[in-house]
Each structure stands twice: as C-alpha cells, then as structure tokens.
Amino acid sequence: MHTPSGPLPFYRSLYFQVITAIVIGVLLGHYWPETGTAMKPLGDGFIKLIKMIIAPIIFCTVVVGIAGMEDMKRVGKTGGLALLYFEVVSTLALLLGLLIVNLVQPGVGMHVDPATLDTKGIAAYTAPGKMQTTTEFLLAVIPTTVVDAFAKGEMLQVLLFSVMFGFALHQFGGRGTLVFDFIEKTSHVLFAIVGFIMKVAPIGAFGAMAFTIGKYGLGSLIPLAKLMGTFYATCLVFIFGVLGLIAKAHGFSIWKFIKYIKEELLIVLGTSSSESVLPRMMAKLENLGVRKSTVGLVVPTGYSFNLDGTSIYLTMAAVFIAQATDTPMTLTQQLTLLAVLLLTSKGAAGVTGSGFIVLAATLSAVGGVPVAGLALILGIDRFMSEARALTNLIGNGVATVVVGKWTGDLDEKQMRYHLDRETEAEANEPEAVLDEIDQHMPVPAAR
C-alpha cells in the first residue's frame, strides 16, 4: 500500500506551481505576445495527454464499480436520479443567465450594425447551422465499433459500453473474478499515469495562458468589459447561491468543497478546459466518500448533461447579441430560445470552445438573432471559457456528491473528514487515492 508522505514544501505543491505558471504565462503573453502565442503547443500537448487517458479510466472505474455491486437496481436508480438532477440544475442555470442579462442589459446602447461585422472568423462555426434531433443524439451515443468509441474519446459511447461490460461481468459472478481483478489493477496503473502527467500541469497551464493573452491581449477585454463582468458575476451567483444552497441542504459547505478541489480549479483556469482534470476529479470524489460506481456514472455523464457554466453563457450571449444589434426579442422568443437551448446545451463537451460552437449552431437554426453578431464575442470567448469551465467543474462535483447522498452511496463521515482536513499528499498523488479506497473493494458477487 502506498503511504502518503508528510506535507510538501510549498514550492513543490501543485497549487503553488500552477499559480506561478499562470502568472508567468500572463506576463509573457502581455509583454511578448508573439512569443506567448508560440507557447500554444504546450497547452495543447497537456490537454492531449489527459484526453489520452480519459476513456480507459472511465471504462475501468465504471466496470469495477458496477461489477462489484450486489444490487444491480442501484445502477438504474443512480442514473435516473443523476439525469433528473442535471435537467433541473442546468435549467436553473439557463434561467439565471436569461434573468441577469435582461436585468443588466450589457448590450444595450452599442447599436452595432450586423452588416458591418467581419464574419470571416466565425464562418467555420456557422457553416453547419444544423442541430441534432433527439433521435440523432441518442443514436450518436451508440458507437459504430467499440474501438471507434475509444479511439475518438467519445465519453457517452465509452460510458455506454462500460455499463454494459460491467453488467455482463457481474452476471459471471465468481467466474469473472480474474477479469475483475485485472481491470481493477489496471485502474491503479492508469491513475499512476495521471500522476505522471500532472507533473507537467504547470507547463500546460503556462502555455495555454501565454497563448490566450498573446493572441487576444488584455486590451480585447475593454470594449466588452460589461458583458465579461456580468457573466463572471452571474457564475459566482450560481456557484455560491444556487450550488451553495444545494450543498448546504445536503450537509456540506461549498466553500470547503472548492478548497478541496483548488488544484483542479487552477489547472482548469490555466487550460480553459474542465476535461483536463476529469481523471483527478474522479479520484478526489472517490476519496471524498462517494462510491466508485456512482462517480463512474455521474461524472462522465455530467460532462455532457450538466454544464452549468455553459448554460449560463448560452442564454446570456444570445440575448447580448440581440441587445447589441438592436434586435428586439419578445418574451415568447426568449422562451423559445430557452427551450431549444435545453436540448442543444446537452451536446457541449467539457473542452475549450465547445460553448461557442453550440451557440453558433443554435442561433443558426433558431433564427431571429443575427448570427453575424457572434463576431462581437469571438475575441473574448476564450476569456469567458475559463469561467464556463470552472463553473462546469464545480457543478459536476456538487452533483456527484448530491446524487451519492440520494442513493446512499456517500460516506458522510469520510466526506466531513476530508473537507475539514485536506492534505497536500492527497491533492498531489491521485494514484494514492485508489490505494486507500480499493483495498476494501468487493469482487463480483457469486451467483
């Protein structure tokens, strides 16, 4: 068993290293923009390393969690409650964005003529102009082949196969012990790889931040500062208001939870992608006391169905464009937009820029709001992406704990212990989390 060492010197903590990397990245991008822009491969490389490991981690976590369960009805109950939570909370996020943008009206008075906007930069996003139907979305969850799902890193497809594999392995009972043990030990190896990758997280955060500041510049924020400020403030209201109340109602503090995942939040701030910390979040949530099967089902599903920050962004950005271009939107039109976004927001993945792509597709399909207005926010979208990703990450973490409590899959004593006393060793060595949890992991029940 891996025994965590004592507290690390502050300069060796991931928290300190990522903060330092982000600050250096901002300075480099601001004072030497060409050099900062050239750092883009560092950020891209880090995210690719993480994406490389996501599919097998989801597979191992879900299979071991489901195959080790005694009552298979719990899987269906967990999935159903998770989807119910996702739908309710993401709808609240959409409504909050719609409410705030109508109250603050950040686009009123800009009087932008859509015909004068340069739409070359958004052509790639608006060309398709077609949304998936519900049937197409459901069919897209079924992979053409299992290899294709893993090769492309399609989370929902991998999740579907993993659930089916876990059910099938459970049916074998004791005969499946050898396969179960192999997959369970493989998960240890995969999280050890995550530990290696996280050693270069500061380099990835530095490269991504240097590129963002170097390419777009801090000056690009000034003309649209009101929209930026309104969006960031709305995300804070959602996190500490909506999610804070949900957390309090379920026996934990949103402040302590944010402190517990502070390293993950900093990595997301640097990379603008909540997907970059998915493996670490799964390990941290298991360590917090949520059952492995619940973490394996809720977290990957939440990355498609519970993107709270993206939901806030979509309604705010759409109405902002209408306000800025003097395009009137009646209450009926706004409610129609809301209804469409209830569907299209579920198709955004936790990767950089996905929110802008969904917004472009939605405006192209719905009509009423000039699609050319997307050019207004293209320059600041990367900066808004950071707030989206942070809100998405916190929202999915809270969702996992809440669903775990609803289903009885949360060890509240363990949760309180870790929220009150988080150690640097746990934060920096995700593979050690599995050593702590899996020593009591059950084998498939004999049938």
From Swiss-Prot:
Domain of life: Bacteria
Membrane-spanning residues: 13-33, 49-69, 81-101, 149-169, 189-209, 227-247, 302-322, 336-356, 357-377
Localization per Swiss-Prot or TrEMBL: Cell inner membrane
Biased composition (Acidic residues): 425-436
InterPro entries xref list: C4_dicarb_transport, Na-dicarboxylate_symporter, Na-dicarboxylate_symporter_CS, Na:dicarbo_symporter_sf
A Gene Ontology term for the protein's cellular component: plasma membrane
Main location: membrane
Membrane topology: Multi-pass membrane protein
Region spans: Disordered: 422-447
Pfam families (alphabetical): SDF
Any one biological process term the GO annotation gives: L-aspartate transmembrane transport
Record's keyword terms, sorted: Cell inner membrane, Cell membrane, Membrane, Symport, Transmembrane, Transmembrane helix, Transport
Listed PANTHER family: AEROBIC C4-DICARBOXYLATE TRANSPORT PROTEIN, PROTON/GLUTAMATE-ASPARTATE SYMPORTER
Job of this protein: Responsible for the transport of dicarboxylates such as succinate, fumarate, and malate from the periplasm across the membrane.
Similarity remark: Belongs to the dicarboxylate/amino acid:cation symporter (DAACS) (TC 2.A.23) family.
Identification of the protein by name: C4-dicarboxylate transport protein
Gene source species: Leptothrix cholodnii (strain ATCC 51168 / LMG 8142 / SP-6) (Leptothrix discophora (strain SP-6))
Taxonomic placement: Bacteria, Pseudomonadati, Pseudomonadota, Betaproteobacteria, Burkholderiales
This protein's encoding gene: dctA
